[in-house]
């Protein structure tokens, strides 16, 4: 019996040694290969991004690889805490949009236009262009829009008005009922316009003093569906009203930028 117990004990010890040997071997052979303490591309690039921005800027980033170095530079290195870095992927969630309402570090709050209740849970996860809701039937779509107060749907619509008073409305004459009875939120047109505050853009040096400035910027949204993160970006731009410079870490073709 003592012999059998010794065999069992030996087997247990041997098994534990084998289990320990694997991570020890990996650490001894691979530790240096995975040491990133001297790889400074990410924090250096993030620092350059932040330092190149105007004061009190908004930076909209795309995905983790863009965002985490920027957050590291701000929170750990203390670089440009006046800038609000916004991860566009997280804008699809209500809790992240709600964080915009508060001051973070030295960055002032941002107006997301819609209230907490309007974006809660799955509310406004998807917003449809009017023509898509009516299956491409232009006549029905135009009739719906005219009843909602839009006399000429072919003309560009003020972006703030569209997002606040139409896409942000739960009024029965600005929504359509789905098959299960829930309201479908709608945006009237892809053609939008952003009025330019000429005096403000000269004052905050968005443009040079001798530059000519248009009275509005017009663009066309290249798709008939706005997901919550797309709509949130449009809301940020519309509500900003040229008070803060807005930067993107890469082109955003999904919204026609």
What are these regions (language model features)?
Residues 1-56, 71-257:
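ER/secretory pathway lumenal C-terminal domains and tails of membrane proteins involved
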């Amino acid at each position: 019996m003592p012999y059998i117990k010794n065999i069992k004990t030996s087997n247990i010890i041997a098994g534990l040694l084998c289990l320990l040997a694997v991570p020890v071997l990996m650490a001894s052979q691979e530790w240096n290969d995975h040491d990133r303490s001297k790889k400074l591309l990410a924090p250096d690039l993030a620092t350059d991004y932040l330092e190149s921005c105007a004061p009190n800027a908004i930076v909209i980033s795309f995905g983790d690889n863009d965002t985490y170095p920027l957050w590291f530079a701000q929170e750990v290195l203390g670089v440009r805490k006046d800038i609000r870095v916004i991860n566009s992927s997280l804008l699809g969630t209500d809790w992240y949009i709600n964080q915009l309402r508060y001051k973070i570090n030295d960055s002032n709050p941002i107006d997301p236009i819609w209230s907490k209740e309007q974006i809660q849970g799955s509310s406004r996860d998807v917003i449809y262009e009017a023509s898509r809701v009516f299956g491409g039937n232009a006549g029905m779509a135009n009739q719906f829009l005219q009843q909602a107060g839009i006399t000429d749907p072919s003309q560009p619509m003020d972006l703030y008005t569209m997002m606040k008073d139409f896409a942000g409305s739960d009024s029965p004459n600005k929504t359509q009922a789905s098959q299960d009875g829930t309201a479908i939120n709608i945006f009237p047109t892809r053609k939008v316009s952003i009025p330019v505050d000429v005096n403000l853009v000269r004052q905050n040096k968005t443009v040079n003093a001798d530059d000519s400035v248009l009275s509005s910027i017009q663009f066309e949204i290249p798709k008939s569906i706005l997901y919550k993160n797309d709509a949130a970006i449009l809301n940020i731009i519309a509500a900003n009203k040229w008070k803060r410079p807005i930067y993107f870490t890469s082109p955003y073709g999904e919204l026609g930028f």
